[in-house]
Amino acid sequence: MTATTQTPRHDWSKDEVLALFEQPFNDLLHQAQTTHRAHFDPNTVQVSTLLSIKTGACPEDCKYCPQSVRYDTGLEREQILAVEEVVAAARRARDAGATRFCMGAAWRSPKDRDLETVEAMVREVKALGLETCLTLGMLRDGQAERLREAGLDYYNHNLDTSEDYYDEIITTRSYQDRLDTLARVRDAGLKTCCGGIIGMGETRQDRAELLRTLASLPVQPQSVPINQLVQVPGTPLHGVEPPDPFEFVRTIAVARILMPASYVRLSAGREQMSDELQALCFLAGANSIFYGDKLLTTGNPEADKDRRLLARLGMGFEAHACAQAEAEDLG
């Protein structure tokens, strides 16, 4: 069996990553769990809440997305929310146990006039003691710096899949466009949230290459969301063959081994997962979830259901970052 990796590497080869995927299932999970325990409390999960601050009418053609203006999914377009609405939602999320509040807008790239409103949202949410994350599309020069100055902690920009398979899913922005935005985010001193989607018709080789690309970035993403495709009627990917559940767990495990110090988020698609599958994902090294009954436009398990599942597993929520810092200061 491959030796457990406890320090991040940026030089994984394709063959090495595929070899991880091809291990016997129990061996792979043992390696992933051992790696996980070297960096995290194995019985806690970090909790984020996601809010759509501007919904629909996106000009991009991502084949999985109900927010694209190109597909008839029945989604109603909504203008950007008022700052007060966002703050109220963030306060509810904090009171429910979330430590990070993520805000998403269906834009190709934010306009400067909209960025002013978003900056105000970030400042107000930060004032509640929450970490902040944004996903607004591609960023131009100087925009990441503005968001950092407003107090932003994380910026999400997923690679979605491997570079080889990417053109089968999206044609309106290139893979390099995504890498360029990630570089701007890193250069501005922000933390990156970057992952992909499983179940879009890709092969194991594509999944391996996606994870290898993420692990090979100059700084590995601090947060790695692994989504299972949520099939939405009207999108081109509706009806695609779903991924094998054990292959999904393998993907979580390999992500944990390749990026040992990153939070691996069990992200979209949990509503369609059994409790048993989610438990296997936690065993494989997932240690972050979205909390709340909606993710942008798709469903998510009810908060009480998540609490019951974690209680059955003897797991709990990660302590709030501010509370942890205070405890360390007192200690």
Curated annotation (Swiss-Prot):
Q: Which GO terms describe its molecular function?
A: 2 iron, 2 sulfur cluster binding; 4 iron, 4 sulfur cluster binding; biotin synthase activity; iron ion binding
The record's SMART domains line, in alphabetical order, gives: BATS (SM00876), Elp3 (SM00729)
Residues annotated as binding [2Fe-2S] cluster are C102, C133, C193, R265
Annotated residues for binding of [4Fe-4S] cluster: C58, C62, C65
Query: Which transformation does this protein catalyse, written as a reaction?
Result: (4R,5S)-dethiobiotin + (sulfur carrier)-SH + 2 reduced [2Fe-2S]-[ferredoxin] + 2 S-adenosyl-L-methionine = (sulfur carrier)-H + biotin + 2 5'-deoxyadenosine + 2 L-methionine + 2 oxidized [2Fe-2S]-[ferredoxin]
Enumerate the UniProt keywords alphabetically: 2Fe-2S, 4Fe-4S, Biotin biosynthesis, Iron, Iron-sulfur, Metal-binding, S-adenosyl-L-methionine, Transferase
Which of the seven top EC classes does this enzyme belong to?
transferase
Q: In which pathway does it act?
A: Cofactor biosynthesis; biotin biosynthesis; biotin from 7,8-diaminononanoate: step 2/2
Q: Which domain of life is it from?
A: Bacteria
Family per UniProt?
Belongs to the radical SAM superfamily. Biotin synthase family.
Q: What does this protein do?
A: Catalyzes the conversion of dethiobiotin (DTB) to biotin by the insertion of a sulfur atom into dethiobiotin via a radical-based mechanism.
Describe its assembly.
Homodimer.
- The protein depicted here goes by the name Biotin synthase
Q: What is the lineage of its organism?
A: Bacteria, Pseudomonadati, Pseudomonadota, Gammaproteobacteria, Chromatiales
Gene name as annotated: bioB
